[in-house]
Amino acid sequence: MPDVNYMKQLAEQFEKGELKILGDEEHFEFACDQCGKCCRNRSDIILNPLDIFHLTLATGKTCKEVVDKYGECYLGPSSHLPLVRLRYREELDGQTTCYFLGRRDGKFFCRVHEHKPGVCRTYPLGKITAAAKDGGDPLLAPSFFLQEEDGTYCAGLKRAHAEHINQKVIDWVGGPERKRVSNIYGDIFSEFTKAYGKFFDKHNRFERMDKVSQSVLVGALGKMLYLEYDDCKTDDEFLERFRFMMELAKEMCQQVQQDPKYIIKLMQKAG
């Protein structure tokens, strides 16, 4: 769940023709050497609600336990939404390593491979829904693009080019079912963020709220976004619950917009 500025930047790149958009049946050069380099010294892996749900399936922990142990929460600087960044383990040599990185026979592997975060699963592909600059309908349906990388960071890209190793997009991103779930999740979340922006971006409403009110609102949103899915067992159950929670979140934001004193009710619920 990247912040708004990054998505706007991608939309601008798309409009300028600077992104290499790939269709499901297209191929791209890549070979994973299992070097573990992309799983170290990172601070940019954002966990969205679907990622956190999948990590509960992989670890057997509750949503809150996953966030507390494997996440770092912060407020999106432009979205004003609670975001969760993947936490890394500090090593004796000063490096940081993903908690889910394992090693076997000299090769690194992901301990939660079947449920790894979407950003990790699709690398070196990125995902974009290019929105119009005026916030209107998307210019592009959810699509994958090849991230620019010259091979200095990932040796697998160099090897794939030299040995002509290709991957099909739809297979690499987890198949049609994974793509279906991801797209539905994205549609639900996009509808919510559009509404949230209308509630609070106009006239800088969020910035004009006092710090306590901001904290209460963000706390309530964080619970709705990330923590209400412990009894979900399948992707479709998660999607149904997520849609319901985002409708509740929109209603809550509308109440806060219409009646600032509604924050007091939220504080009482939280207490």
List where the protein language model places each region.
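Short loop/turn segments that flank or connect secondary-structure elements
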Residues: M1-G271
